[in-house]
Amino acid sequence: MAKFEEAENRMFNIKICLKCNARNPATAKSCRKCGYTGLRFKAKEPRG
């Protein structure tokens, strides 16, 4: 989707908390804001 591999990694190589929607590092085991362990990777393909 992105033009450069570095840009794509910056945009999509993060995890999103399923409870509070906070952005977390890709290496995170739990959310930095609420401590929830349910994390997903940010979607690389648009929905809809």
From Swiss-Prot:
Please provide the Gene Ontology terms (biological process) for this protein.
Answer: translation
Q: Does the keyword Phosphoprotein apply?
A: no
Keyword terms: Ribonucleoprotein, Ribosomal protein
The record ties this protein, via InterPro entries, to:
Ribosomal_eL40_arc, Ribosomal_eL40_dom, Ribosomal_eL40_sf, Ribosomal_zn-bd, Zinc_ribbon_dom
Would I find Ribonucleoprotein among this entry's keywords? yes
> Which Gene3D superfamilies does the entry link to?
4.10.1060.50
Q: Which GO terms describe its molecular function?
A: structural constituent of ribosome
| Matches recorded under Pfam families | Zn_Ribbon_1 (PF13240)
Question: One GO term of the cellular component aspect?
Answer: ribosome
In terms of superkingdom, the source organism counts as Archaea
Entries under HAMAP family matching the protein: Ribosomal_eL40
PANTHER family in the cross-refs: 50S RIBOSOMAL PROTEIN L40E, LARGE RIBOSOMAL SUBUNIT PROTEIN EL40
This protein is called: Large ribosomal subunit protein eL40
Q: Which organism is it from?
A: Methanosphaera stadtmanae (strain ATCC 43021 / DSM 3091 / JCM 11832 / MCB-3)
What would be the name of the gene that encodes this protein?
A: rpl40e
